[in-house]
Amino acid sequence: MTGALAICDQCMAEPERPWRKAYTLMVYRDYARHTIHRFKFGNAPELARPFGQLMAEKIIKNQLNADFIVPVPLDFMRQFSRGYNQSMLLAEAVSKLTGIPGCQPLRRIKRRSKQSGRNRADRHKELAGNFILKSPAAVKDRNILLIDDIFTTGATLHAAAVTLLSGGAASVTVFTLARTPGHALLF
């Protein structure tokens, strides 16, 4: 696990990326993978606070400015079965510690199959058009910090960012708790 704020150079090099920058806190392997997996699937919502604190420290230290923090929404059934949306809990913790207000203008409109194990093209195809903007006025001309737990291929974040920008957001910056291994990170 690394404590440095990192930008994945592969993500930054992709011309179709809709976000301004993509940041991550750690690499999703070893202890980080185990702990995040517990947070997501092991009924451990209390881990949002220490994870959120680490994210908030990096946001403050690196002066990432945003008008709003927006978490990636889960579909209703997944949130119901899990009991919480881990990205929402992270966003709430980060908002509380940074003073950047949080809002949830996005809604998932399609149920989807699990993304783990799918390739990049399949993920992007599955997630295209997966979100709608509940309140376009909330994001109009605003700089959004989009929060999620794990950045794998970027398909979920891509779909969410496109929806926010199509609704009038000035910019979207992505910040995830972790990034899957195999991608060079810039510090």
Map each language-model feature to its residues.
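Extended interfacial segments that mediate partner engagement and assembly in macromolecular machines
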Residues: 1-97, 116-117
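PRPP/pyrophosphate-binding module of the type I phosphoribosyltransferase fold
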Residues: 92, 101-187
